[in-house]
Amino acid sequence: MNEAEELLGIHLTELGLPFERQYPYAKGRRLRADFALLDSWLLIEITGGVYHGGAHGSVEGVLRDIDRLNAATLNLWRVLRFTPDQVKDGTAIATISRTLGAFALEEQARGAREPTT
């Protein structure tokens, strides 16, 4: 686990959000997300390789990331991706909080539209 992952784990814990680390999200594939908020079907990835000359910045790395995002979407997950700097400056946890609030509003709206008997 790197520094940004450790910090995001602290932020999620401070907000009282239960999460899983290195969560396998696609059956039959060896794909894992850095964090999963299971109750919200939200995966969180911290992409640091671009900044450190890692695989994410290569053509092959970009194609792998596209495949991973598509696999998550096909398995009904929503995905947020952040850089280590966004975790450190608070952008990531603020975005996660806003996203979870939007999910709650969406659920309320769906409930209001469902027919009653």
Predicted regions and their residues:
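Nucleic-acid endo/exonuclease domains
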Residues: 1-117
